[in-house]
């Protein structure tokens, strides 16, 4: 896989997948499912595209019944394509996948999402917090409204979803929060995003300690540069041409390369002794976290 991508720019967050060139890769013939999540119910936020879509796809292949959220309007086409895909690959025993349009930045919406999933599937075994937005901006240009918007999307939503999902999660359940390599390395232009991703690391660690007595594991994934709709919606065309080249592997990841980390953390047979931990699929960008 080469580093960098054709110049392109999207003007609105969180970006659209179906217009990207090349389209992010969410599946691979090299991935061999083995019923790791047979009988499980998974809720994935931001599952219409990017890492979230790849996670939904892997979970469905592994036997889970999958629900995902998306932002109504710009993401409709991506969400419908993901739902179609999940219908195609779901196992015989899994229930039909569902998609839920919502703005996760508000508590009442997070409560409604959990209620819809429980009404459809009866419970939640795996909660994946993947939805996010980011903006390139100088500290002088950050205003209160957008700062609140980014924090609501990226970290408030995780608090609210966990709050309402917990009563429907039993011992052996798993919560997986998406943070980022920028929480460890920093980023000079993504200040709001970086702050939220640092908060997610601390939230994950504290929540893991709080829920350990209940037998619910809480972990995180801190991806490096990954080719998702957030990228052309955040960076200049010139930056897109070089995206991923700063890693020792000299390229960005595709979502399908990151999704197996979420499978591992969701599967009790694989990660039963993991809690409060962060996995780092980052191409070697950080090696001492």
Curated annotation (Swiss-Prot):
Taxonomically, which superkingdom? Answer: Eukaryota
> What GO molecular function annotations does the UniProt record carry, in alphabetical order?
oxidoreductase activity, acting on CH-OH group of donors
- Active-site residues, Swiss-Prot/TrEMBL: 193
Could you say which EC number(s) this protein's record lists?
A: 1.1.1.-
Which residues are listed for substrate binding in this entry?
A: 180
Keyword annotations of the record? Oxidoreductase
Binding of NAD(+) occurs at 43-67
UniProt keyword annotation of Oxidoreductase present: yes
Region annotation Disordered: residue ranges? 1-32
UniProt keyword Flavoprotein present:
no
Briefly state the protein's biological role. Answer: May act as a short alcohol-polyol-sugar dehydrogenase possibly related to carbohydrate metabolism and the acquisition of desiccation tolerance. May also be involved in signal transduction.
What family, per the record? Belongs to the short-chain dehydrogenases/reductases (SDR) family.
Q: What is this protein called?
A: Glucose and ribitol dehydrogenase homolog 2
Q: Which organism is it from?
A: Arabidopsis thaliana (Mouse-ear cress)
